[in-house]
Amino acid sequence: MWLHPALARAATCPNLNVHPGITTLIVQGDYGEKDQASKAYVVSLQDAIKKSQNFCYVDDVRAATYALDVAGVDIDEEHERAALSVVVVSERGMLITHWVRISSVDNVGKNGQDDLHKMDRAIQRAKRR
């Protein structure tokens, strides 16, 4: 079966046997009920994974090869900006990488995509070790 690149779809994993060898990810967020900018960042990261050709988003931590744990707090009264701590941990509990991000609601899409690339590079480095 030949796939035209424009018709290729992102990996989806309701059945992990369909995509053997695909890297599965889960995003777990910890933020307050009113922290809308933090929530928007977590959703943007989940969306970036769902659109990715290299990764598959899963909802069950037991099915995840890596977990992205995001702790965030909105830093202004309008809930337009958030300070976020992102930690990537392997299924074996090994710390892969950690970074801190300031994100505004206006640029969460770009930040989610950029951080997915950052995480991909960190995972590739960890696999070479």
Residue ranges and their predicted role:
Residues 51-56, 64-110:
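Surface-exposed short loop/turn segments
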Residues 7, 22, 30-33, 60, ...:
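Intrinsically disordered, low-complexity regions
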Residues 10-21, 45, 91-129:
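C-terminal/domain-edge helix-coil "capping" segments
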Residues 9-10, 54:
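Residue-level marker of positions within ordered structural domains that often coincide
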Residues 13-21, 59-63, 76-80:
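Short, surface-exposed loop and linker segments with low hydrophobicity and enrichment for Pro/Ser/Thr
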